[in-house]
């Protein structure tokens, strides 16, 4: 499907007056909530704000601006499902997750903790981009900020899992893509049979002119070329019966089941309108996981014959008060201040200027 409709979607996003960034607030293991993890006493190396990284050469690309160990580490074993839960402000049902204008892919990397902290050894274990007119971020919003990966059958030890969103609403100019990532502290307790590859360096895996980073979502296209390395062909985990895990839990038994030979991918759900309000029903559903060996797109970098996408699950969270959006008055840094059909304030806070990136999106940035 051609994506010439994304200009219309950008207009719809502007009409909603949503200019939201995002961070990972929590993690679920085998559908068990591990609680808020984005604090010094938690298990996520969280930044002090939800502002993006835009310089692909910055050391902040590794784990965002707060690459420091936190108090807790989650315990998992091969085959366990790890679900990352993203939000704009809070785990409230009314939270908008991330601006619907922030179209782009979602990827997940992992690395041994010591190497990963230093920016080395990062292995891509999952990716989800653009399929049949739907971006990974669209699916993330629909699923209330959740996407999942399977723990590979790797050696026991401590690892960092690094979920990453690349928002491409300003990707039509060099340096315009926005990167959102955190590092989740995880201990694998099973003794796997697979050796994690050497991996890549982050920063270093991307350049500002990579086809998947300098990418114009407002022009017609059929597919999306993922930046960085291919998904590791050993990324599929294995477990005879994944059990619920908790933070700092007792070591789990070693898995003896062989890992699948192909990657896992999500069965895509129908696309929804950018203006549709997210569901707040107190239900939980998990998307169907299937195997695929489809050939990679000719427009994407060379990858193995099968690819891996991020599985997503929808679940609601407890409702707490949600701050209102800034529809009037001075607009804060990084928030929208103009564009076609935009109805909010066009006056930025002192020291900021309203920068036009494209006809659909103006943003308050440092003067």
Curated annotation (Swiss-Prot):
Entry's EC annotation: 1.14.99.56
GO terms for cellular component: extracellular region
Entry remark concerning the domains of this protein: Has a modular structure: an endo-beta-1,4-glucanase catalytic module at the N-terminus, a linker rich in serines and threonines, and a C-terminal carbohydrate-binding module (CBM). The CBM domain is essential for binding to and subsequent oxidative degradation of polysaccharide substrate.
Start and end residues of each stretch annotated as Disordered: 37-56, 234-287
The keyword rRNA processing appears for this protein: no
Protein name as it appears in the record: AA9 family lytic polysaccharide monooxygenase A
SMART domains named in the record: fCBD
Main enzyme class: oxidoreductase
Cofactor: Cu(2+)
Major place of residence: secreted
Compartments where located: Secreted
Keyword ATP-binding: no
Gene3D superfamilies named in the record: 2.70.50.70
PANTHER family according to UniProt: ENDO-BETA-1,4-GLUCANASE D, PUTATIVE (AFU_ORTHOLOGUE AFUA_1G12560)-RELATED
PROSITE patterns cross-referenced by the UniProt entry: CBM1_1 (PS00562), CBM1_2 (PS51164)
Secretion signal span: 1-20
Residue stretches making up the CBM1 domain: 329-365
Binding-site positions, Cu(2+): 21, 102, 180
Practical uses of the protein: Lignocellulose is the most abundant polymeric composite on Earth and is a recalcitrant but promising renewable substrate for industrial biotechnology applications. Together with cellobiose dehydrogenases (CDHs) an enzymatic system capable of oxidative cellulose cleavage is formed, which increases the efficiency of cellulases and put LPMOs at focus of biofuel research.
Superkingdom field: Eukaryota
A Gene Ontology biological process term: cellulose catabolic process
């Amino acid at each position: 499907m051609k994506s010439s409709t994304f200009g219309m979607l950008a207009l719809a996003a502007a009409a909603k007056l949503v200019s939201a960034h995002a961070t990972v607030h929590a993690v679920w293991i085998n559908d068990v909530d591990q609680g808020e993890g984005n604090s010094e006493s938690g298990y996520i190396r969280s930044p002090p704000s939800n502002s993006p990284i835009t310089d692909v050469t910055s050391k902040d690309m590794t784990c965002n601006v707060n690459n420091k160990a936190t108090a807790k580490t989650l315990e998992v074993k091969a085959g366990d499902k790890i679900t990352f839960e993203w939000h704009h402000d809070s785990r409230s049902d009314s939270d908008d997750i991330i601006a619907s204008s922030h179209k782009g892919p979602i990827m997940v990397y992992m690395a041994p903790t010591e190497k990963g902290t230093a920016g080395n050894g990062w292995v891509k274990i999952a990716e989800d981009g653009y399929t049949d007119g739907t971006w990974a971020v669209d699916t993330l919003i629909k699923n209330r900020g959740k996407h999942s990966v399977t723990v590979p059958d790797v050696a026991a030890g401590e690892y960092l899992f690094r979920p990453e969103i690349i928002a491409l609403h300003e990707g039509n100019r060099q340096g315009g893509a926005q990167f959102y990532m955190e590092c989740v502290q995880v201990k694998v307790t099973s003794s796997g049979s697979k050796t994690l590859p050497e991996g890549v360096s982050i920063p270093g895996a991307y350049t500002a002119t990579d086809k998947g980073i300098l990418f114009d979502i407002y022009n017609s296209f059929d597919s999306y070329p993922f930046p960085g390395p291919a998904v590791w062909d050993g990324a599929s985990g294995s477990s005879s019966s994944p059990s619920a895990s908790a933070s700092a839990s007792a070591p789990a038994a070693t898995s003896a089941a062989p890992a699948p030979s192909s990657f896992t991918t999500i069965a895509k759900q129908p696309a929804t309108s950018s203006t549709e309000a997210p569901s707040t029903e107190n239900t939980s559903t998990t998307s169907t996981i299937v195997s695929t060996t489809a050939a990679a797109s000719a427009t994407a970098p060379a990858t193995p014959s099968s690819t891996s996408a991020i599985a997503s699950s929808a679940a609601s969270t407890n409702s707490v008060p949600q701050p209102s959006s800034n529809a009037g008055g001075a607009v804060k840094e990084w928030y929208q201040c103009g564009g076609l059909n935009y109805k909010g304030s066009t006056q930025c806070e002192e020291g900021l200027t309203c920068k036009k990136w494209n006809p659909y999106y103006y943003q308050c940035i440092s003067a």
